[in-house]
Amino acid sequence: MKKNIRRGITTRTTGSKRKGTPRGKGRSVQTIAFGTDGWRGKIAEDYTFDNVRRCTQGFAEYLMSGYSRRDLSRGVVVGGDRRFQSEHFAVAAAEVLAANRIPVHFCGGGVPTPVISFSVKARNAIAAINITASHNPPTDNGFKVRDENGGAVAPDGLKKIEKCIPANAAGIQRVNFQDAVARGLITQFNADEDYISQIKRMVDLEPIKKAGLKIVVDPMWGNGAGWFSRLLTGGKTEIIEIHEERNPIFPEMKRPEPIHPNIDAGLAYAKKAGADVVIFTDGDADRCGFADENGEFLDQLRVYGLLALYLLEVRNMRGAIVKTLSTTSMLESLGKLYDVPVYEVGVGFKFVAPKMIESDAVIGGEESGGYAFRGHVPERDGILAGLFFLDFMVTTRSKPSELLKRLFDKVGAHYYDRIDLVVDAGKKEKVLKRFHTQLPQQVAGLPVVRTNRMDGFKFILPDGSWLLIRFSGTEPLIRVYAEASSRDLLHTILADGEKLVR
């Protein structure tokens, strides 16, 4: 472990003020494990300032082992969301990086994840730390890391970071935030302008402004608040925002995730307002959801199909599509129609981002409403996805329901749903053991023609319908996913899936 004194920097260990007896020294502290998208925990239980500092120290050690001192001088972007104390946890992370002589570009709290990620590229940084629990319940917070491309760190990198995390608080380097600012180790900056310039390069906003649409935006009390208004005001289009204030309790929803029942209040408001379209962004604005002109929710698999169709048909782009195994088979159909490869990877952008870079993909995405695009950063961006969806509507002069019909005319109707079952660790292990010894031969009365064990257990049926059972890496959940060619078949598949894990 590195010493606590670095040349030219006075540092201190986290713990007791009594000299020589730092709190946590010699005491076992919980193991921190990174799931599909970083580390998350309950605030004041396992998600504490000491544990955030431990994570940051581990990340600093990881960076110092892989980069020269010259490259380290490019620095790390640090920001966070609107959750309870996020800006203070971000300060804690910045103090640790600075004490390790890694410069910090600090953008503070309330900054969307895609803005933080793009800042890595804009400021030529080597990485980012993002304090956010994304769509988790209000009791939680989280710690995301991003690489020098602004995308998720690959699984091998995450394992290395975990190994670098000190066993207790005694191994943490710290320097006072204001002292680090005075010494030039921490630079505070506004990340918005670089991102806005990038958005204007990616999509022409003027036709959307002039279209005269009525758009209801629900940022779900999160970081997406104000962004669509800021980008689209100045024309005939009207932007109406709800749930735009900061409120880390997330009233009127269980969590800031754009699925039922969290979207119900937004849908009810949009119907009364007569909206042409509804856009939801999750807590950190990297994921999104949409509802049509009738207030009907468009599930995220259909949205992925629509965004891919928009890029392939309206923009005439060509290139690979990267998808997680939990998202739609409509993408394979589009790949055949437009003669582009489709790559299926494990769940999480830690798998999607590296494959996007490797294949120069046009789009990459997952079933939870996260989509990334060529020419941007290999990171989910709910704001850019929302603007692309609006551009699809305006360019084709179509309502959302008409866009969906256009998609289904090409690939056939698809229906999707997901059930999340809260379980304890013992139940998870029991189900896993059963599946490793005996797999179902039939689902919904249909034979299983193929089983994919890449990430969980995916059972593919003869007509392309599928059931996926997987175990969350960040929450105590078993997730049951299904996609089918009819609603009735979908319900039967889901019911069978739920029985399999009971």
Name the predicted role of every residue range.
Residues 2-5, 17-19, 23-95, 99-100, ...:
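An N-terminal, well-structured beta->alpha segment
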Residues 28-29, 141-273:
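Gly/Ser/Thr-enriched, mixed-charge loops and adjacent short helices
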Residues 37, 78, 116, 129, ...:
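Buried hydrophobic positions in well-ordered alpha/beta secondary-structure cores of metabolic enzymes
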Residues 65, 69, 75-140, 230-291:
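N-terminal small/polar loop signature for handling phosphorylated ligands or for N-terminal nucleophile
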Residues 78-82, 217-219, 292, 375, ...:
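Short glycine-centered, acidic/aromatic-flanked micro-motifs in structured strand/loop junctions
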Residues 104-114, 297-300, 322-324, 345-346:
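Active-site nucleophile and cofactor-binding loops and adjacent substrate-binding regions
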Residues 276-277, 313, 317-502:
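Phosphate-binding and adjacent anionic-ligand microenvironments
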